[in-house]
A protein has these predicted regions:
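DUTPase catalytic domain/fold
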Residues: 1-144
């Protein structure tokens, strides 16, 4: 099992652990209490910095209940943390946009992440035809 060096930048959050022992995703928590009005945005501090292994990256996403509970959206849809973001003060943050007034308490579970290997190198081969039937265009799958 790989070991990852982590620095906790807040004493207000619980230590990282797998989600209830039944997932390979790990919860991330708000490192401080934040109040947002509808239409405001901020970088929500997550209270950690870590050194990812070479060749790996972290995929950060909101929890499925985050929008329902707080009315916030992760403004970049998905966060990618690569292994070069590994300094003592390189705190992970979640860019959020509030759709309604909300209060996020320190230690609230707000996001989740997993660590993935980088995509292997690929080479693109340009062609005039792909040789497969068209399926109706983007957004058409499942239409009657």
């Amino acid at each position: 099992m790989p070991k990852i060096r982590i620095r906790y930048l807040s004493d207000k959050i619980e230590k990282l652990r797998y989600i209830d022992g039944k997932s390979d995703w790990i919860d991330l928590r708000a490192a401080e209490t934040v109040e947002l009005k509808a239409g405001e945005s901020c970088y929500l501090p997550l209270g950690i910095a870590m050194v990812l292994p070479q060749g790996y990256e972290a995929h950060v996403l909101p929890r499925s209940s985050t929008f329902r509970n707080y009315g916030i959206l992760m403004s970049n849809s998905m966060g990618i943390v690569d292994e070069s973001y590994c300094g003592d003060d390189d705190e992970w943050k979640m860019p959020v946009y509030a759709t309604r007034d909300c209060r996020i308490e320190a230690n609230d579970r707000i996001a989740q992440f997993r660590i993935m290997e980088h995509q292997p190198p690929i080479e693109f081969e340009e062609c005039l035809h792909l040789g497969n039937p068209s399926r109706g265009g983007f957004g058409s799958t499942g239409q009657p």
